[in-house]
Amino acid sequence: MRVTIRDVKVICCAPQKINLVTVKVETSEPGLYGVGCATFAHRHLAVVAAVEKYLKPYLIGRDVSDIEDIWQSIKGMSYWRNGPVLNNALSGVDMALWDIKGKMAGMPLYDLLGGKCRTGVPCYTHAEGTTIEDCVQKVGALKERGYRCIRAQVGGYGGKDMPYQPPEGSFEGCYYDPKAYMAKTIQLFERLRETYGWELELCHDVHERLRPSDAVIFAKDMEKFRLFFLEDCLSPEQSGWFKQIRQHCTTPLAMGELFNNPNEWLNLITEREIDYIRIHLSQIGGITPARKLIALCDAFGIRTAWHGPIDLTPIGHAVNIHLDMASPNFGIQEWADTNTLSEDAGAIALHQIF
């Protein structure tokens, strides 16, 4: 039976003022549809326009089974490609088509991808404090909840909200002191190891807020804390510096949430300059390219740690989990935890879904 695409719709919502975008692909078979995550929270309206004005006219009438051909055609049809707007729009369609394929086959996504490699998915979450002691206490609370790997920060990502002292005589504005951030972070991890010993796995996210030369020093200084990984210590534009970091320390390195295309990750993987790939699935175009990235990483001993932030739809989180289940080189899954604002009668608890 040939099943074709009948309609493509975009659904936008903004829980807690976070712009989330979902694509719904409806088919010629009554009641058969698929959904996919297309969330680019900072430019969501551009993604909506890309789906409605450009992808939808092309997709109507296409066979839902031709996932690879549809993905390749959309990727190249705009000529200028590999940007976050088109990739997120493409992701919404791609995930929806995989969803349809799974429903037609009567199989979950992880079975379509080759079957389960594990029965559960280890996750890490975030502890962010305004002070060192605040963060230490939050790590303890998460430990009590059962987390065995925790990302710790003072002042949020890369210390962006950390108290600072503006330079004397400076103009009003925002100042960031990388040296103060580095020193405060080292103090934090000294306290964490002093308090919890080596029973916890710990991570840290620099969030690209260091100059390359400072990142080399910082990664070396963090080596003694035996991190599970140090995340995004460089911006994608400066990824050539990973070679210097690798030469100076053994701290495991994670990178990738801002990556859009293979040219950004290829050398890091084939040269084994990172340990974990951290891409945001919708940012690279969905499940179809993620499968290929998993296989590439597996060949070079790199493990996955997909980006799992709050600005991701539940569909995106579910896809992360399915890929984790089916990947032999799965490492760990970021989980931004849940914040239930309301619950409808009869709603299924999130832990029951996963």
For every predicted segment, state its role.
Residues 1-40, 338-345:
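Structured beta-strand/loop patches that form or line metal/cofactor-binding pockets in enzymes
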Residues 1-16, 103, 107-120:
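N-terminal amphipathic alpha-helix/helix-capping segment at the start of soluble metabolic enzymes
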Residues 5, 31, 55, 93, ...:
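Conserved, mostly hydrophobic/aromatic
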Residues 25, 53, 69, 220, ...:
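Shared catalytic-loop signature of beta/alpha-barrel
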Residues 28, 32-104:
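Metal- or metallocofactor-binding catalytic centers and their adjacent structured scaffolds
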Residues 96-105, 136, 140-144:
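Alpha-helical scaffold segments that flank or form the walls of functional sites
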Residues 108, 122, 201, 252, ...:
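Proline-centered loop/turn at the N-terminus of a beta-strand
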Residues 120-248:
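Metal-dependent enolase-superfamily TIM-barrel catalytic cores that perform enediolate-based chemistry
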